[in-house]
Amino acid sequence: MTILLVTRSFVTGEAMSESEKSLYDSKENVLKELLLTYGIDSTETQRRQLLKHIELLIEINKNLNLTRITSIDDALVLHILDSLLPLKVCNEFTSGAQNYIDIGTGGGFPGLPLAIMSDNKTLLVDSIGKKINAVQSMIDEIGLGERVRAEKLRAEEIPNDYKQKFDFVTFRAVAKTNILLEYAEPFLAPQGTLIVMKANVDEIELQDASQAAKIFGYENVSRETFELPHDLGHREILLYRKVGKSKIKLPRKTGMAKSNPFVARRD
């Protein structure tokens, strides 16, 4: 018996055996307690949907490389908890139905878990079409298609109707922070928030990010650190608010942000 069968039958409402229900309940309780340990409240429906995401991810991953994490217990920490840590530092994220984009979403992280835990109208983008097709299928299976969708898109290729549209932008371990500040700026509405999720941030990266923030019209709101359970890693979340206009026209040509990034002067 596997958790895949358990969550599928539970979410779709099909009848489960007692052993199946017991196994599902154990994972749902583990997730509930895990989130509560970090001060994150969740409903039973949200936990069902979060588990459904992991179920679908593991199943699709058999044929398409979306993640190296194939253990349900590790996925609860490294995918679900990790994705939801921004809720600890950005209360505004769940304050109403807002526009949110997750860039470089991969297997739907952190965007899909954050969409599950909020009422935000959510767009998940990635440059790889196969990943986007998989993520859209997961969105539909979970039942969030009315307000969440996936689209193939590069960070530097911004349709006009996406410019200055989003209240929140997230990146999870995609690139250095100064580069992410540049990528996000054209998407963000005035006073919008960029949420950067990293494993480790050194002093040089922070200095470069500070310089880029001045150029692109941001203020640094906060830097918070977390330790994942079971020694599964250190996490940092940086929040930036768009408070002014960029001093240069963005986006630059494709590839320029990485090949010629804005950095702090080195003495």
Predicted segment positions?
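N-terminal amphipathic/basic-hydrophobic helices that include classical n-h-c signal peptides
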Residues: 1-15
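Class I SAM-dependent transferase core
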Residues: 17-20, 27-95, 137-144
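Residue-level signal for inorganic ion chemistry
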Residues: 57, 114, 198, 240
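Conserved SAM/SAH cofactor-binding pocket of Class I
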Residues: 84-175, 181-184
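Short strand-turn motif at the edge of the Rossmann-like AdoMet-binding core
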Residues: 174, 197-201
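Helix-to-beta-strand junctions that scaffold the AdoMet/dcAdoMet cofactor pocket
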Residues: 188-190
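Short, charged/polar "capping" segments at the starts of alpha-helices
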Residues: 202-206
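SAM/dcSAM-binding transferase cores
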Residues: 207-267
